[in-house]
Swiss-Prot record:
Species the sequence originates in: Desulfatibacillum aliphaticivorans
Protein's recorded name: Probable transcriptional regulatory protein Dalk_2958
GO molecular function, one term: DNA binding
Gene Ontology terms describing biological process: regulation of DNA-templated transcription
Transmembrane intervals: none
Keywords, sorted A to Z: Cytoplasm, DNA-binding, Transcription, Transcription regulation
PANTHER family: TRANSCRIPTIONAL REGULATORY PROTEIN YEBC-RELATED, TRANSLATIONAL ACTIVATOR OF CYTOCHROME C OXIDASE 1
HAMAP family listed in its UniProt record: Transcrip_reg_TACO1
Length: 247
């Protein structure tokens, strides 16, 4: 596994605009609902739900909102029946793209995702064509201005992290999914502020994408992420900072 998770950086830069459009809350509510449906409404016994609730709290979602989403997932309240699907393909420049969809209409989602790939210069592939290139990991980003590497490494590794590495002006903490909560809590307890933290999928290897293809790749990723039926987008593309535009 190598390379900075650039798509996470892109989403972080664009996060404020997404929040204004309500997309962050909408995606979190979907995730909480399906996590509760699949694993029950007790976050202590449901790691996926616990992670989703923590993400909602980090975005300052009102407690009533996520509690209602849990009840819809467990059936206590009537709600939309979301299903999970995965789409795989390649973007401009050859970077792998993995798309996770939570939708109440598979046909609509598939058609829209296929259209986005085509419109933005990508190609949608068969199931299994790129999923094997990604590993599910806990991923925590800490700016180097708030702590030093030795301090962060000691805290993170003691809590169960598998790696701490330098990437530009940040440190990346990598964990197994089951260890993510404990590591994040240990970093928070030490008073170290995090820039980004989630259970995500990281590429085992990255593909450098530059120039016009990098700009096209960013457009593909952002258009996919803006789709209401898309929950998460992952890529193996290593995109230069100058291709990552501000909103």
């Amino acid at each position: 596994m190598s390379g900075h998770n650039k798509w996470s950086t892109i989403k972080h830069k664009k996060g404020a605009a997404d929040a204004k459009r309500g997309k962050v809350f909408s995606k979190l509510i979907k995730e909480i609902t399906i996590a509760a449906r699949m694993g029950g409404g007790d976050p202590d016994a449901n790691p996926r739900l616990r992670t989703a609730i923590n993400a909602a709290k980090a975005e300052n979602m009102p407690k009533d909102n996520w509690e209602r989403a849990i009840k819809k997932g467990t059936g206590e309240l009537e709600g939309v029946n979301y299903e999970e699907f995965q789409y795989e393909g390649y973007g401009p420049g050859g970077g792998a793209v993995l798309v996770e969809s939570l939708t109440d209409n598979k046909n609509r989602a598939a058609a829209e995702i296929r259209h986005i790939f085509s419109k933005c210069g990508g190609s949608l592939g068969e199931a299994g064509c790129v999923a094997w290139m990604f590993d599910k990991k806990g991923y925590i980003v800490v700016n180097q201005s708030v702590t030093d590497e030795d301090t962060l490494m000691e805290i993170a590794l003691e809590a169960g992290a598998e790696d701490v590495r330098e990437a530009g002006d940040v440190f990346e903490v990598i964990t197994q999914p089951d260890d993510y909560d404990a590591v994040k809590e240990a970093i928070d307890a030490a008073g170290i502020e995090t820039e980004d933290a989630s259970v995500t999928k990281l590429p085992q290897n990255t593909v450098e994408v530059t120039g016009k293809e990098a700009e096209q790749m960013v457009r593909l990723l952002q258009t996919l992420d803006d789709c209401d039926d898309v929950q998460n987008v992952y890529t193996s593309a290593d995109i230069p900072d100058d291709a990552i535009g501000e909103d």
